[in-house]
Amino acid sequence: MKLIVISDVHLKPGMFERASELMDEEKLDGAVCLMDLPDDWGHGKDFGLYIETYDAASRFAAAYPETKWCWGNHDLSYKWGLDQSGYSSAMQGTVRGLQGRMADLLPAGNPIRYAQRIGSVIFSHDGLSDLYVREAAPSIKGNDVDGVLDRVNSRGARYLWNDESPIWLRPQPQYHPTKLFHEKAMLQVVGHTPVDGIWRQGYLISCDVFSTYPDGTPIDTQEFLVLDTVTWDFDGVQ
């Protein structure tokens, strides 16, 4: 299966428009969004931009109903009412309403989750570590990947709002090198941490390349990860 990954949107509705074009241009089979739809530098009260971003995400969800969606920390700060850098209290009620509207568009059985699996690839906002799995699902055998993910996806803020969870981990070697869940058998794809171009190290692909500096200047390459979930071959496409 060849798919596109939309990572760390942060109020850039045009990402969904371009991803939709690439679905046709690249003849892709599906899409995954690692979310972080809200929040960007200096836009904490830009009501129109929040609406525009969620409208674009909702249109994409309606056009491609099999898309997999993964909660990011910025999404969950509104869902759970937890403050963090970039969070806008002025937009709390608006974002919660937009999240609910978008959730209603998704097919039954395909809700937004913390971690998603397609074949031998696990997608999450920021990585699923072996340590977190051993704490979250000690009675589930590691080769029962779906059982582990079901357990992780059933958890709430108490177990997710910490640095070891799949929304905060930063498993890149320069930040928090760690053993990933089911290494060698599973590839993991993450966003959250801005990187200088899409890259793979071991069994991890990092693809948050749309982040910007406070003045709006792009930090990274602003390209989409296109991944073959069978061969693990990948490319970046603008």
Name each model feature, range by range:
Residues V5-I6, W71, F123-S124, V190, ...:
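Short hydrophobic beta-strand that contains or immediately precedes a catalytic carboxylate
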Residues M1-L3, P65-K68, M186-L187:
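Short active-site oxyanion
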Residues A90-A108, I112-L180:
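Active-site-proximal loop/helix segment associated with metal-binding centers of metalloenzymes
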Residues M1-I4, Q116-F123, Q201-Y203:
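Beta-strand-turn-beta hairpins that frame and shape the catalytic cleft
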